[in-house]
UniProtKB/Swiss-Prot annotation:
Any GO CC annotation of this UniProt entry: cytosol
Name assigned to this protein: Triosephosphate isomerase
HAMAP family named among the record's database cross-references: TIM_B (MF_00147_B)
Species of origin: Orientia tsutsugamushi (strain Ikeda) (Rickettsia tsutsugamushi)
Keyword check for Isomerase: yes
Highest taxon in the source lineage: Bacteria
Length: 249
């Protein structure tokens, strides 16, 4: 099975810088299969980048509206149907930065996930525990609670991204055993909701300080791929990660 590699650009790059960066990645990695790469770019860039690079890469929105209507009086919102009209096939939902900075709760995230599914967009749903939950050994319960609000999605195409909050943007990373423990727990919870006659299409990726130095170890922890932040903004580290991932597939 090919590993999933999601590059989350967050609020980085001008449009011209984005085009130049993707051109460089393409030219320097012509011998690799880049079609499995998913770039989560600023929503403003989706249309232009898809026109230029749609045959080479997949693109993901970094967020989607919780509003169920396809259109209406909702200033600043971008509906799932609008993304689908651009042939965007992925959307990040519930990233810890949005949970923290924009107070997104379980109900909001569930609405966004449902909107994605109803529009044939694969949601990349982020879950993760704060350092307090890790220290007091309640992290599995914390993560299970986050998963419970989106259990309806487990029979659909969905990507679960485990990103421990305390690891994002830091030099700290869980051990391989820690990641494997969470992956196992996620699989166990999924299996409670998936009938035996339905194939499990849920994928699990790890995010949180993924780098060229630890990518090999992370991919041995039972994950289906990685969600990369700052390491994917640098050509050298992203190229190393791509080569490592494809060397293991």
């Amino acid at each position: 099975m090919e590993s999933i590699v999601v590059s989350n650009w967050k609020m980085h790059f001008s449009f011209s810088e984005a085009c130049n960066y993707l051109n460089l990645i393409t030219s320097l990695n012509s011998n690799l299969n880049l079609a499995k790469m998913i770039f989560a770019v600023p929503n403003l860039y989706l249309s232009g980048l898809k026109l230029k690079f749609n045959d080479t890469y997949h693109f993901s929105a970094q967020d989607v509206s919780m509003i169920t209507e396809s259109s209406g009086p909702y200033t600043g919102e971008i509906s799932a149907s609008m993304l689908k009209n651009l042939n965007v096939n992925y959307a990040i939902v519930g990233h810890s930065e949005r949970r923290l900075l924009f107070y997104e709760d379980a109900n909001t995230i569930a609405l966004k996930v449902r909107n994605c599914i109803n529009n044939a967009i694969v949601p990349i749903v982020c879950i993760g525990e704060p350092i307090e939950a890790r220290k007091n050994k309640t992290y599995l319960q914390y993560l299970a609670q986050q998963l419970s609000s989106i259990s309806f999605s487990f029979t659909k195409n969905v990507i679960i991204a485990y990103e421990p909050i305390w690891s994002i943007g830091s030099d700290m990373i869980p051990t391989i055993d820690d990641i494997y423990e969470v992956v196992t727990m996620i699989r166990e919870i999924q299996n409670r909701y998936i009938p035996h006659n339905i194939e499990n299409s849920v994928k699990i990726v790890y995010g949180g300080s993924v780098s060229a130095n630890n990518i090999h170890q992370i991919l041995t922890a039972g994950v289906d791929g990685v969600l990369i932040g700052k390491a994917s903004l640098k050509l050298e580290s992203l190229t190393t990660i791509i080569k490592t991932v494809q060397g293991l597939d």
